[in-house]
Regions:
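Cytosolic, long alpha-helical scaffolding segments
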Residues: 1-302
Length: 302
């Protein structure tokens, strides 16, 4: 069997290759706890199971049923196809061959970028309630992250799928790491958004916003560089991180010289600085995944 891959290369497979059986798993209810059962659902999803059955020895309580449904709603492509008093059957309805790791990563990056931009804008305008909006979007980042991890794990176990996705073994590993950094950045931004409303000093707001704007550009360059394998942008991110550190140190100096009478404000400044640094480090780490030119280009006179 001959198949054309996304990079226009051709893959040959034995003509007698059989279609893979649908992967199914049964999870007993009640388990040790509802939290343990939900973790099993997440684990089965990430391991690539197509059908996940919750098998009850007794009726599934209303509260537990709602928690199970809430957990399943967090998993892209997983839909409840049947249920009764003691059973819940869900199925993954997306075709892995139609998914694209790059598009999912870009989607994650777009959501995270929007979270960060709105956090800074809300901070500048001193708007209330922005942290709740950010937290809800962080949940969507997690959903996309789980989908990408599922796809990557499936590709690791299925060379045919990996070939269709145009991903080498190293690419698969790099996408997994990059996605993890994006997911972590979403969590750090949620922490960042929680700390900012407490800060009200004009000079501190100005300096934190200045440093924060630099982090925004770092994300754009690191993710674009990673996807396009552009080492130049990777080097720019590292240089920008050095400049960012200078701005952070300046913010720390201002905070020590500024008369802050509330302990909560002092703690909020420290949390915001610490959170911004963790976010920036995520972009540096993604930039570090970009292969050097000598690993992506053929050697001359070889």
């Amino acid at each position: 069997m001959i198949e054309v891959n996304r990079n226009n290369s051709i893959s040959l497979y034995p003509s007698d290759t059989e279609t893979e059986d649908v992967k199914e798993v049964n999870i007993p209810y009640p388990g040790l706890s509802i939290e343990s059962l939900i973790n099993q659902i997440y684990g089965a999803y990430l391991l690539g199971y197509d059908i996940i059955r919750i098998r009850g020895k007794s009726l599934i309580s209303f509260d537990d049923r709602e928690l199970i449904k809430l957990a399943m709603r967090k998993l892209v492509g997983l839909e409840i196809v049947d249920e009764d008093g003691s059973n819940i059957i869900s199925q993954f309805l997306l075709d892995a061959n139609t998914l694209d790791a790059e598009k999912i990563l870009r989607r994650m990056s777009s959501i995270v970028a929007g979270m960060y931009k709105d956090t800074l804008l809300g901070f500048q305008k001193r708007e209330n309630g922005i942290e709740k909006l950010i937290a809800s979007r962080d949940d969507e980042v997690d959903r996309q992250y789980f989908l990408l991890v599922r796809l990557i794990r499936s590709a690791m176990m299925d060379q045919k799928l990996a070939s269709k996705l145009n991903l080498s073994n190293i690419d698969i590993l790099d996408y997994r790491i990059a996605a993890n950094h994006l997911e972590s950045a979403g969590d750090y931004i949620a922490d960042f958004a929680t700390a900012l409303p407490i800060i009200s000093h004009d000079k501190l707001i100005k300096e934190i916003t200045h440093a924060g704007t630099l982090v925004e550009i770092m994300q754009e360059k690191s993710v674009a560089g990673f996807i396009n394998k552009n080492r130049v942008e990777s080097n720019e991110v590292v240089s920008m991180y050095a400049k960012f550190n200078e701005l952070l140190n300046l913010t720390k100096e201002i905070s020590t010289k500024t008369e802050i009478y509330k302990q909560d404000t002092t703690i909020a400044v420290l949390i915001s600085i610490f959170s911004m640094d963790k976010i920036a480090r995520c972009w540096v780490d993604i930039a570090d995944l970009i292969k050097p030119v000598y690993l992506t280009a053929p050697l001359k006179n070889a």
